[in-house]
Amino acid sequence: MPTDVEPVTIPDFLKWKSDRRRIAVLTAYDFPTARLLDASGVDCILVGDSLGTVVQGWETTLRVTIDQVIYHAEMVARASRRALVVADLPFLSYQVSPRQALKSAGRVLKETNCQAVKLEGGRKMAATIRAVVDADIPVMGHVGLRPQAIRRLGAYKVQRSTDEIMDDAQAVAESGAFAVVLECIPREMAAKITAQLTIPTIGIGAGPHCDGQVLVYHDMLGITEGHRPKFVRQYADLGQQIKAAVAGYVADVGEGRFPGETESFR
């Protein structure tokens, strides 16, 4: 991989907002995936607590631990040469107090070499975001649908409380976050928030007017089985391709066709 590429920085995000240059974000959880995404021009790689659902197989993100995030984020940060790497702070690693959040965020940056952390919440998390940012740790916010609040919400659904969500996004920006994820909100609301804020908005299920977009890697490549959210555009069907390839291998082994002459030593 080339070593002379210019890495994406936090100031780049803010400049791209003013330049109206869209920001492409994808998730990754391991070295080879991050290396592929980085080489493909992704601006930012998010090591999301979504690893709980798409990697570990749980129904929610709530079981993910900070040690697990650190384990995955270290691999991703080591693979990335250009893309900004952001790691999620998982459930109950920051909600107790700003002090707890600072300790967790510090661990993540120090032990993974990623560039920033992401945490969920708006006005109620303003003091927490400020405490982390004041320690020179960049923070990406997350408002709208908050997966870590699934037990209270009851279901993953579009959030329509306009005033509340707009106030949350504004609070995140005023607390010093460098960007904010808008998840599962009406496109008109996302457009208003994007126009109102001086920091980039990164949409997931928030329409086309955000400053950037994020998707889960496994969803957009067709690896995840089962229900696909409305906001996901599937760019490949790797799940079926993997099944076909493995079935071919199993058949070749069973029939004695593998290994053949070209795969054998003399």
Give, region by region, the residue ranges found by the protein language model.
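Alpha/beta enzyme core
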Residues: P2-K230, A236-R266
